[in-house]
Amino acid sequence: MNNFSYFSTVRTMFNNDLKEGLAQARKVLGVKKAMILTDPGVAALPIWQEMQQAMKEIDFGFELFEQVKPNPTDVTMEQAADALKATDCDCVIGFGGGSAIDTAKAALLATNPGSLRDYYGMNKVQNKCLPTIMVTTTAGSGAEVTQYISIVDTQQQTKQQIGSPFCVSDIALLCPALLKNSPRSVTADAGFDALAHCMEGFIGRKANPITDAIAIQVFRMITKSLLKFVNEPNDIDAASDMILAAHMSTMIASNIGTGDGHNIGLAIGGRFNISHGTTLAVLLPHVLAFNVEVAAPKLAECARVMGIDTDGMTELQAAQACVLAVQQLRDDLHLPNNFKDFGMTITDEDLEKIADTAEYKNKVGASAGSAPRKGTREDFKRIAVDAYHGVKVSF
């Protein structure tokens, strides 16, 4: 067995009663007033009013910031940090999906000097952020459990990350009831993000017995409940499975990184403003197929967890069956299978930049050395082109 380390400091609270969960979180942190950050989409939903009502009923003071953008930029995040510094809030609550939670984490600027660009990379944050409570309203990004902030840099037109233990949420509040009546597209998009975290971590070279155990349980919950939850958004058991699966899958990603689905996806999503889950839905089958031979034992195990009859199959055949099943799940969820339909074009210059990002992410940062098969620049460009055109994976 190889040496490994496992990092987890976030306190997870699973509570189907939002008011009760918030009261517990406030008591643990000993705080009085929160800046709550969300995006206009969530602010238009009934759960936003439920959140404010719950805060009032427990006498938890708050200010609101409702201007979070999807795929938040450095500009938006710094505006949020400035808004926080202008208040007397002693804690921050991120309420929403990964964008709201990452923007809430960017409150680090309230206790650290300079701009976000000063902290790109790992372990550059010097001071602890204000206490944070992350209340997720989607089951996908798992941003509430990571030490990372994903940022679209407006100058570089690519996604950057800040990584630091100081960026870990103090409390992650998981309330499945908040997922009720989630739009089908949001649920499918977020769920595929969780699936990609799980699978890329499981087959990665940094995987260890702890992350493997989590991954198998997460994979079981997602393949059992994602499609059901998309089709039956009021199913509280399916919602519980998915909110936990997303949370747990990111425990994997935050410890051992992801793979080339994320490495290529960060370049495409940041450059063309496509949601992270959708980007991964298009890319993941291609990346799994690229790795199928070196990752055959683990992908074969995934096939069995999915209920695929692997009797009489070789390990490689079972692994290939798993890849095809993941592709079929993507299609059953009615997620996009190509980038071309977004009206985007990929030029030779774009392909070089995609290869630059993927190559860099394979060498630097949380996912460095994690991909099971070492890809070349030409491999990355070929995967991007196949994904752009929606080439169907086959064996």
What are these regions (language model features)?
Residues 1-29:
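N-terminal amphipathic/basic leader segments beginning at the initiator methionine
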Residues 19-35, 53-58, 86-87:
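Glycine-rich phosphate/diphosphate-binding loops that line cofactor/substrate pockets in enzymes
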Residues 35-36, 91-93, 133:
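Conserved beta-strand elements of the Class I
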Residues 43-115, 123-124, 228-239:
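N-terminal small/polar loop signature for handling phosphorylated ligands or for N-terminal nucleophile
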Residues 110-207, 298-305:
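A glycine/threonine-rich phosphate-anchoring loop and its flanking beta-alpha core
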Residues 166, 299, 309-395:
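C-terminal charged capping/lid subdomain of soluble metabolic enzymes
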Residues 201-328:
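Active-site segments that bind and position negatively charged phosphate/pyrophosphate groups
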